[in-house]
């Protein structure tokens, strides 16, 4: 596949290696959900889901539409929607066997009624708020009674119960430990009340890496699938992860500018000497952070080149000083390795004032994804949601 502007390269082999590393670290018998929300953190939900299928018991998404896309492309294992779902989407969820989070009796009653009307059984996971203050029942006696009432509703099956750590990615695990204790006790109380809960899960990526004692029945692997650690406070010598995505562009034009020449919008960069600069075919319209303007660097022929002036929607300029061999058509690495140099998602996030999870998620739909494994291209190039030929 030929690319003439910008593309993201996703290494499915590295994703497999990351899954193996996590799987080997889990306690025996612990299952794993693969979190593929936001199009698998920008990596492509369908190719990623198919790649990790043998490692997981199911998938976690954030929206109904994300779950439906997986079903349309033949994903058969459990799909758990982690975010709240309105009653207007219940029929689609029932028809496509999508498990829903549940944290209010009235919501459960509406889902039960819809399931009875459709002649189907709805699967739910009880959401428990142990410290995130997002969604979920508080882990108290009153909530145990609510879960009992929900469990008695017709055409509804409790498939699991979960909570989410708010601070497991910090060096101090005190908060995560307290959340785990609350959740563990609530799970025990619910089961003691006669409610069957097949799967209890609380550990996110940070929990998988550093808190194996909190694994419970299942864990939810997210950012670690894609080769990134949740934060720089999470130890990186426990599980070896490899970044799965690179972002590459091209030099489309080279020119020489003289002293006093301004570069890009606002003239925020003005040349102090004669310079050779490159125009690169990528911009914030592709999801490349505009906040890298005048601060970020790219790799050309294994050397770092500074971004000059403001990043435009579709293009930006870079300094070719010290890279005399650069020519039009040459590859430009925005994220990834070139020779002995590497630019990571974490570096881009730090320089731009963002969050490293954001960087791959923001890479736009107009950026083709090239999938590779063991150095060879697999599947096909994808630029739009439904283009999954070859997978």
Language-model features and meaning:
Residues 23-26, 269-271:
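Short secondary-structure boundary/capping segments within folded domains
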Residues 1-16, 31, 39, 66, ...:
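Active-site anion/phosphate-binding pocket segments in diverse small-molecule metabolic enzymes
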């Amino acid at each position: 596949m030929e690319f003439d502007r910008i593309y993201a390269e996703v290494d499915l082999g590295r994703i497999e290696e990351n899954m193996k590393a996590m799987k080997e670290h889990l306690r025996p018998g612990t299952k794993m959900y693969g979190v593929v929300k936001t199009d698998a953190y920008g990596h492509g939900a369908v190719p990623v889901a198919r790649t990790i299928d043998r490692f997981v018991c199911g998938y976690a998404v954030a929206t109904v539409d994300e779950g439906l896309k997986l079903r349309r492309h033949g994903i058969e294992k459990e799909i758990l929607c982690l975010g709240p779902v309105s009653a207007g989407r219940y029929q689609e969820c029932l028809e496509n066997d999508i498990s829903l989070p549940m944290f209010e009796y009235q919501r459960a009653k509406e889902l039960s009624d819809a399931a009875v009307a459709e002649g189907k059984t709805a699967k739910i996971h009880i959401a428990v708020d142990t410290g995130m203050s997002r969604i979920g029942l508080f882990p108290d006696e009153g909530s145990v009674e609510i879960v009992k009432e929900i469990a008695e509703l017709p055409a509804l099956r409790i498939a699991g119960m979960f909570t989410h750590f708010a601070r497991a990615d910090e060096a101090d695990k005190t908060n995560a430990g307290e959340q785990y204790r609350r959740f563990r006790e609530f799970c025990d109380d619910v089961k003691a009340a006669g409610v069957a809960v097949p799967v209890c899960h609380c550990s996110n990526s940070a929990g998988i890496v550093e808190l194996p004692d909190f694994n419970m029945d299942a864990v939810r692997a997210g950012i670690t699938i894609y080769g990134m650690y949740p934060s720089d406070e999470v130890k990186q010598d426990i599980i070896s992860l490899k970044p799965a995505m690179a972002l590459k562009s091209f030099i489309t034009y080279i020119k020489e500018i003289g002293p006093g020449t301004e570069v890009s919008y606002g003239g925020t960069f003005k040349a102090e000497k004669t310079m050779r600069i490159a125009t690169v075919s990528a911009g914030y319209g592709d999801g490349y952070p505009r906040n890298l303007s005048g601060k970020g660097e790219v790799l050309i022929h294994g050397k770092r080149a500074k971004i000059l002036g403001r990043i435009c929607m579709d293009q930006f300029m870079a300094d070719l000083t010290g890279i005399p061999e650069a020519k039009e058509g040459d590859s430009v690495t925005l994220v990834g390795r070139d020779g002995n140099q590497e630019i990571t998602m974490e570096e881009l996030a730090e320089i731009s004032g963002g969050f490293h999870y954001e960087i791959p998620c923001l890479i736009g739909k107009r950026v083709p994804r090239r999938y590779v494994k063991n150095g060879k291209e697999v599947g096909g190039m994808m630029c739009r949601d439904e283009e999954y030929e070859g997978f």
